[in-house]
């Protein structure tokens, strides 16, 4: 089933909404209600928060950049950057493990660790795909890629 390419207007709407979501999440995590309002997060979250904020900032800035120009090579480069930072956030979260599930820890700790490991693996695969995509775009030039 062939998909129709999105119009530039639709893509720009998506970039604008994504940038706005990054701002809203950053505000929610840092200002109100703040990460410490989440009952199962521990003070260890302060060790993860700088990378979370970096991820939100880079996501915001890349989406703003895509509003101006979104050629495939530029999108692939932005995706490489955001995926790399996301992996760093996930690895830091797994190492620090800023969660306290109280009486349910014996159930939720391994589930949460498993989800984090799955996300690290999936994000790493996604990063590899973006690196290959970027390389193909550099080799083949700006024309469409035919699989």
Predicted regions, residues:
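C-terminal halves and exits of single transmembrane alpha-helices
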Residues: 82-104, 128
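Short, charged juxtamembrane terminal tails flanking transmembrane helices
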Residues: 1-3, 136-147
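Alpha-helical transmembrane segments of integral membrane proteins
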Residues: 46-56, 78-85, 112-123
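Alpha-helical membrane-associated segments of multi-pass integral membrane proteins
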Residues: 103-140
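N-terminal signal-anchor transmembrane alpha-helix
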Residues: 1-57
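Membrane-water interface at transmembrane helix exits
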Residues: 30, 34, 65, 91, ...
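Membrane-interface helix termini and inter-helical loops of multi-pass transporters
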Residues: 35-42, 99-108
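Loop-to-transmembrane helix junctions at the membrane interface
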Residues: 59-92
């Amino acid at each position: 089933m062939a998909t129709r390419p999105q119009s530039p207007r639709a893509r720009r709407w998506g970039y604008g909404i994504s940038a706005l979501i990054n701002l809203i999440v950053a505000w929610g995590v840092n200002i109100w209600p703040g990460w410490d309002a989440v009952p199962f997060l521990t003070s260890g979250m302060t060790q993860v928060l700088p990378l979370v904020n970096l991820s939100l900032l880079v996501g915001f800035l890349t989406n703003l950049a895509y509003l101006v120009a979104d050629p495939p090579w530029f999108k692939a480069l932005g995706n490489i950057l955001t995926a790399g930072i996301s992996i760093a956030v996930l690895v830091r979260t797994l190492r620090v493990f800023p969660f306290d599930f109280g009486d349910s820890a014996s159930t939720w700790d391994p589930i949460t660790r498993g989800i984090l490991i799955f996300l690290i693996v999936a994000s790493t695969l996604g990063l590899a795909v973006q690196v290959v995509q970027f390389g193909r775009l550099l080799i083949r030039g700006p024309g469409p890629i035919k699989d």
